[in-house]
């Protein structure tokens, strides 16, 4: 059922929605195959420090010092950094969908995502996100992470929209639930087809009327 108030704004996650994930377990497993480090040790150290990195409290260089380069390695810091950034790849159909909906309906598009500074800066530039995203509410910029309500409220304040005007798209069901509790419309993204169909129920369709 379409909302009684027109949707003016799309809040959208980046990892596993517009682009692939940046540095999750699958990426660390891939790094193990390339660099041959102790995956269990890296995973444990990453679990203890990555939240601080995503909140903008430590740099990528500091994160790597604590997680990988706390001991001598046969590979360089630069090689690991380049590998990490290279894991980001586009999800072309989702990028096309969001661009097309913005063009057709004049939507504000706001990225609301958890990410580290070096990752998100690379992703914004590499994939041309500024061409269609109006503002970026990123954990490392605002020092708050989903599912904390603070980051959602900041997104609403900065975009200057009411919750009922917003459709929020995220691959994490919990993050969608938080947005819905704040009054936004939510879509749990699991595939392009299901998200496109869900957006259409809010009056955001690319089909000719």
Question: Residue spans of the language-model regions?
Answer:
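Asp-based, Mg2+/Mn2+-dependent phosphohydrolase catalytic module
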Residues: 1-12, 116-117, 121-209
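Active-site neighborhood of HAD-like aspartate-dependent phosphohydrolases
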Residues: 2-45, 182
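Short, acidic loop-to-helix structural element flanking the phosphoryl-transfer center
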Residues: 6, 69, 78-110, 121, ...
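Alpha-helical elements of Rossmann-like donor-binding domains used by nucleotide-donor carbohydrate transfer enzymes
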Residues: 26-30, 48, 62, 66, ...
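Short, surface-exposed acidic
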Residues: 35-45, 72-82, 204-209
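A metal-dependent, Asp-based hydrolase signature
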Residues: 51-81
């Amino acid at each position: 059922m379409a909302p009684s108030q027109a949707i003016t704004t799309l809040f959208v996650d980046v990892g596993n929605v517009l682009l692939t994930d940046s540095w999750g377990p699958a990426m660390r497993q891939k790094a193990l195959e390339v660099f041959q480090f102790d995956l269990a040790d890296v995973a444990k150290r990453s679990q203890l420090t990555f939240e601080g990195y995503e909140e903008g409290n430590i740099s990528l260089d500091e994160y790597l010092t604590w997680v990988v380069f706390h001991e001598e390695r046969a590979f360089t810091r630069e090689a690991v950094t380049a590998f990490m950034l290279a894991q980001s790849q586009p999800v072309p159909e989702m990028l096309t969908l969001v661009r097309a909906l913005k063009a057709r309906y004049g939507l504000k598009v706001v990225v609301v995502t958890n990410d580290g500074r070096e990752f998100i800066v690379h992703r914004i530039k590499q994939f041309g996100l500024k061409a269609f995203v109006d503002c970026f509410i990123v954990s490392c910029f605002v020092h708050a992470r989903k599912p904390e309500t603070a980051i959602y409220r900041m997104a609403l304040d900065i975009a200057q929209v009411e919750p009922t005007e917003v459709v929020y798209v995220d691959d994490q069901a919990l993050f969608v639930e938080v947005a819905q509790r704040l009054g936004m419309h939510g879509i749990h993204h699991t595939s392009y087809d299901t998200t496109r169909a869900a957006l259409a129920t809010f009056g955001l369709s690319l089909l000719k009327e």
